[in-house]
Each structure stands twice: as structure tokens, then as C-alpha cells.
């Protein structure tokens, strides 16, 4: 049983997957997408879901700091519905407030260059989101 964690942006989709026991999240990759065109990398997601035998998907849900739902959170809701329809798997929207900032902080602490951070930040945000979800289940 593995869980897939996703961090949706307008141009990229950060992807992480849990270990088989559901204890730890590992970053897999960042998929290039085009939200305006409705291109979400579903073919690649299908390959990842099949390869890792995923049974649940967790999508970052970026609420505003006051708990309200803004445009990015609405985009995540639409994306979650698309995933449920496409893959027939349970999709959980997970509060991801500050996940990108936490990922950025970890990369800075690890002395990762700005250029490299830009390349991996979405994947790391997906790891933060998924790990938060997994920790809540322990």
C-alpha cells in the first residue's frame, strides 16, 4: 500500500511516494504541466501509480492563512476531482499551508544552490505534504 503525494503548481507538479509501510515520503520527480491548457501529466501519473502500486492520492490543498479557500485551493479541488475520475482512487485534499516555505528552508539549510532549489522545490513540497499526511496516520 503506497500513497502518492502531489504538489500542484501552474507549470509543474511535484510528485512524492510513500514507502510500502506508509511511514516515509520520498520525492520522485517534477512533471511539467500546463494548467491553462488542462495538461496535467496524467499519462506519466498513470505510469507512476502503476509502477508503485499506489492506492491513495494526497493533493496539497493551499488554503489561505485565515483558512479560507482561494484560487489556488480551488484549482487543487478541480485537480482532485479530475484524478478521482481518471484513476478511480481515493483522493485526499491535505492542508499544505507553508509546505513550499518548509521545503525551501530545508534546501537552504542543506546548502543547496538557488538554481538547484528551483529545480527540486516542487518535488520537495510534495514530500512535505505527503510526510505530513503520513505522520497524521501514525
Curated annotation (Swiss-Prot):
It is found in: Cytoplasm. This is Putative pre-16S rRNA nuclease. It is an enzyme of class 3 (hydrolase). InterPro entries: RNaseH-like_sf, YqgF, YqgF/RNaseH-like_dom, YqgF/RNaseH-like_dom_sf. It comes from the Bacteria. One of its GO terms (molecular function) is nuclease activity. CDD domains: YqgF (cd16964). GO terms for biological process: rRNA 5'-end processing. Keywords: Cytoplasm, Hydrolase, Nuclease, Ribosome biogenesis.
Amino acid at each position: 500500500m503506497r500513497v502518492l503525494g502531489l504538489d500542484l503548481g501552474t507549470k509543474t507538479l511535484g510528485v512524492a511516494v510513500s514507502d510500502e509501510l506508509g511511514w516515509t515520503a520520498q520525492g520522485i520527480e517534477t512533471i511539467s504541466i500546463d494548467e491553462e491548457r488542462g495538461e496535467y501529466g496524467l499519462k506519466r501519473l498513470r505510469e507512476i501509480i502503476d509502477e508503485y502500486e499506489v492506492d491513495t492520492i494526497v493533493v496539497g490543498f493551499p488554503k489561505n492563512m485565515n483558512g479560507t479557500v482561494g484560487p489556488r485551493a480551488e484549482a487543487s479541488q478541480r485537480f482532485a476531482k479530475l484524478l478521482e475520475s481518471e484513476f478511480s482512487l481515493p483522493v485526499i485534499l491535505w492542508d499544505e499551508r507553508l509546505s513550499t516555505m518548509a521545503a525551501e528552508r530545508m534546501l537552504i539549510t542543506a546548502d543547496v544552490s538557488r538554481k538547484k532549489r528551483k529545480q527540486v522545490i516542487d518535488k520537495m513540497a510534495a514530500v512535505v505534504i505527503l510526510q505530513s499526511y503520513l505522520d497524521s496516520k501514525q
